């Protein structure tokens, strides 16, 4: 009897083999989705979630709503694409974005960092008026094209296709003559002691520059990013003015943020 299926992939005969294949997919793709894996292996979504929970305990993956991402420390060279990130936590990102966009009032000058959560904020700004918005995200800028009442500024610079974001000296210099009311900052990892961090050095440098020219730093994220640390630090946790996050945030992280003087806005799905 053949040990391969119709696609030529080795047939999974047990839990260990299935988990090994999931690890391979994480390393190849950067992310996986529960429903896809359930259909692929012919097991329940509960079984797949248990697999992902096991991999998270092993430090291989970090769970998110709808799937999981590869840990940066496991495969530093793998970064999920914008498309992969967009497929995860979509409902939660939209809830976070809805809370964030309510903070933007006529006359405000805002920075929208690149990312999938800030993209959702941009989508909700279509009816805003008398707002100036600068971004380094190509997908964010495209979403703002339909917001006729928003004056759009781009940082320019070198384009990272993987994240659809601009970076570099030109991007950093474009910020130096501006002062903004608020920055909406998307992040890859948050740790109370190690601060806010990301996997890309160039983006971390640009993010630090954004923080310098913004009156308020507002982090928009989901709870899966907590108790994680990526290679390149952006800022200390204490520098965050506000964080908008889902109710799944770990209790110790929530307590620590509030003790640090960070205003926390909790949202449901």
Curated annotation (Swiss-Prot):
Record's protein name: Putative aga operon transcriptional repressor
One example of a Gene Ontology biological process annotation: regulation of DNA-templated transcription
InterPro entries xrefs: AgaR-like, Carb_Metab_HTH_regulators, DeoR-like_C, DeoR_HTH, NagB/RpiA_transferase-like, Tscrpt_reg_HTH_DeoR_CS, WH-like_DNA-bd_sf, WH_DNA-bd_sf
Domain HTH deoR-type: 15-70
Keyword terms, alphabetized: DNA-binding, Repressor, Transcription, Transcription regulation
GO molecular function: cis-regulatory region sequence-specific DNA binding; DNA binding; ligand-modulated transcription factor activity
Function: Probable repressor for the aga operon for N-acetyl galactosamine transport and metabolism.
PROSITE patterns: HTH_DEOR_1, HTH_DEOR_2
Gene3D superfamilies assigned to the protein according to its UniProt record, in alphabetical order: 3.40.50.1360, Winged helix-like DNA-binding domain superfamily/Winged helix DNA-binding domain (1.10.10.10)
DNA-binding region: 32-51
